[in-house]
């Protein structure tokens, strides 16, 4: 099982980052993608991936929260990072109209620019969308024929939005959000709609600790080593064999990010 979304550059991991990676290995996590959310963190993510070759890879991008930071210098930084073999996707990029930490116009501009970069470099995109589906689709769709692959990370949208994403050819990342008995029930019921070859799993660590873990981790910090719990629950709710699903999501991740 491959974790496609780990915020390993987070300061929450500053004191034990190497142990976090070791625990993931021991738990059976077969690889992980370290998320870049701005120019600096994308550089840090690449360095971590380089230090753990053939187990960690990274993305290079600007999260919509940081879209106001977009500039020609940032674009050039991402371009240079994308030349490195450890960097396998452009992103995390997209739109977030929930928290609006950057203006909508800035978000759309940075999103479109990163899609253009991914198309130019023939790289997959690692996508973010929250409460912005209509504009997200409008910006994304013209680029899809020029992109080798795309995954919408941490999907939490509606059934209609899921159908639209699948119709666009996107793969879908599922996190521990689905384990939340308050917010995750609707998503749980949608799991069987995702074709097996389009399903990816992720922790989004250190965020989104699965609420149904027992005993509950005392730190309340999510880690990649908790991915087996998400896998087990998703397999249960999809009515699938756990081992087969583990192999499937690992294959899906490696295929999407060009690792096989």
Swiss-Prot record:
Source lineage: Bacteria, Pseudomonadati, Pseudomonadota, Gammaproteobacteria, Enterobacterales
Protein's organism: Pantoea ananatis (strain LMG 20103)
InterPro entries according to UniProt: DNase_TatD-rel_CS (IPR018228), Exonuc_TatD (IPR024918), Metal_Hydrolase (IPR032466), TatD-like (IPR001130), TatD-type_Hydrolase (IPR050891)
Subunit-structure text: Monomer.
Entry-linked PROSITE patterns: TATD_2
Keywords tagged on the record: Cytoplasm, Exonuclease, Hydrolase, Magnesium, Metal-binding, Nuclease
Superkingdom of source: Bacteria
Protein known as: 3'-5' ssDNA/RNA exonuclease TatD
Family matches, as CDD domains: TatD_DNAse (cd01310)
Cross-referenced Pfam families: TatD_DNase (PF01026)
GO cellular component: cytoplasm
Cited function: 3'-5' exonuclease that prefers single-stranded DNA and RNA. May play a role in the H(2)O(2)-induced DNA damage repair.
Molecular function terms from GO: 3'-5'-RNA exonuclease activity; magnesium ion binding; single-stranded DNA 3'-5' DNA exonuclease activity
Binding positions for a divalent metal cation per the UniProt entry: 92, 128, 153
EC numbers on record: 3.1.11.-, 3.1.13.-
Disulfide bonds: none
Compartment(s) of residence: Cytoplasm
């Amino acid at each position: 099982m491959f974790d496609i979304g780990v915020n390993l550059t987070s300061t929450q991991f500053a004191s034990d980052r190497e142990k976090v990676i070791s625990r993931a290995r021991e738990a059976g996590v077969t690889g992980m993608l370290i998320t870049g959310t701005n120019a600096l963190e994308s550089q840090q993510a690449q360095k971590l991936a380089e230090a753990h070759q053939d187990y960690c890879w990274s993305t290079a991008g600007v999260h919509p929260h940081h879209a106001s930071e977009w500039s020609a210098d940032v674009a050039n930084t991402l371009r240079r990072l994308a030349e490195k073999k450890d960097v396998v996707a452009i992103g995390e990029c997209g739109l977030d109209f929930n928290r609006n930490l950057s203006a909508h116009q800035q978000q759309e501009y940075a999103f479109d620019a990163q899609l253009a970069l991914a198309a130019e470099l023939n790289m997959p995109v690692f996508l973010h969308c929250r409460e912005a589906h209509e504009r997200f689709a409008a910006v994304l769709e013209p680029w899809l024929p020029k992109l080798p692959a795309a995954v919408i990370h941490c999907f939490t949208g509606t059934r209609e939005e899921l159908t639209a994403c699948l119709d666009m050819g996107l793969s879908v990342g599922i996190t521990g959000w689905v384990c939340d008995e308050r917010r995750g029930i609707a998503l749980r019921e949608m799991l069987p709609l995702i074709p097996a070859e389009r399903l990816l799993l992720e922790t989004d660590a250190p965020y989104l600790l699965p609420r149904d873990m027992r005993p509950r981790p005392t730190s309340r910090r999510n880690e990649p080593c908790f991915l087996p719990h998400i896998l087990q629950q998703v397999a249960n709710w999809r009515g699938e064999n756990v081992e087969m699903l583990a192999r499937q999501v690992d294959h899906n991740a490696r295929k999407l990010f060009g690792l096989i």
